[in-house]
């Protein structure tokens, strides 16, 4: 099974924000995607490391598509998410990659119980790394329905 047209080996999943969740999933075995690592990073840490991650030829990228709504506008200016999305868009363009976007509303499918069931759980931080893992899980399930059987918990 091939996950996408780029024949990627890895999936880089990003939940952008002031604290950004990032994870890398190994897709070599389509029936058993494996979390390589997950982390929660600051904006500066993201700036320092994202180019090296996105530029890897065998890596596909998925990111949460953050939208400014009336409600988010009331909470804060929140430029970080949009700025980070723009940076990732540019780096993907520069690397000749298609960037996949996911809505925040897609995350609830990948609840904590499902993340733990397939060892996609991150310990520590404020939950942003787990949100990146949620986007990774949704991306994998959208492309491999067989893997969904493992999620029936």
Regions found by a protein language model. Give the residues of each.
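Phosphate- and other anionic-substrate recognition elements at nucleic-acid/protein interfaces
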Residues: 1-153
């Amino acid at each position: 099974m091939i996950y996408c047209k780029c024949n990627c080996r890895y999936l880089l999943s990003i939940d952008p924000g002031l604290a950004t969740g990032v994870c890398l999933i190994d897709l070599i075995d389509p029936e058993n995607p494996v979390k390589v690592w997950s982390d929660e990073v600051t904006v500066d840490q993201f700036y320092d490391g994202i180019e090296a991650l996105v530029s890897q030829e065998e890596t596909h990228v998925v990111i949460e598509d953050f939208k400014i709504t009336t409600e988010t506008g009331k909470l804060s200016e929140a430029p970080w998410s949009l700025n980070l999305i723009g940076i990732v868009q540019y780096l993907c363009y520069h690397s000749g990659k298609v960037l996949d976007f996911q809505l925040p509303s897609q995350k609830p499918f990948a609840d904590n119980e499902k993340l733990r069931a397939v060892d996609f759980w991150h310990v520590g931080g404020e939950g942003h790394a787990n949100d990146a893992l949620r986007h990774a899980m949704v991306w994998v399930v959208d492309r491999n329905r067989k893997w969904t059987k493992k999620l029936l918990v």
